[in-house]
């Protein structure tokens, strides 16, 4: 059943225009899964059109009420959102962390001076280096003339 589900999911992704993404497991934790920055940008841009998505990914914790009335709380692993973290940045509004084997990835929505930047950092060497890598990009944005134009 999972194989049939994954086949249909991959067909759906292809039909939606995510032509360079292939998933082998519903969890996404398969080292053979493939995607590209282009597909990550496309799906993120599409989801960011939804306010409910922005609300969820910008929080360090999110509690959902399930159909049976019970609740489930998720803790966001993006330490840019954690006010107790050395990496906390009030201008980061999500989006997704991910890691497989020795690759640490991070997709970030950064808001500064009324502008939004979608940053996809793939293949960092450690959990902390993914935040250092993105911080370097954020610093470059902050110091550029682009924000004053």
Task: Give the role of each language-model region.
Residues 1-149:
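Penicillin-recognizing serine hydrolase domain
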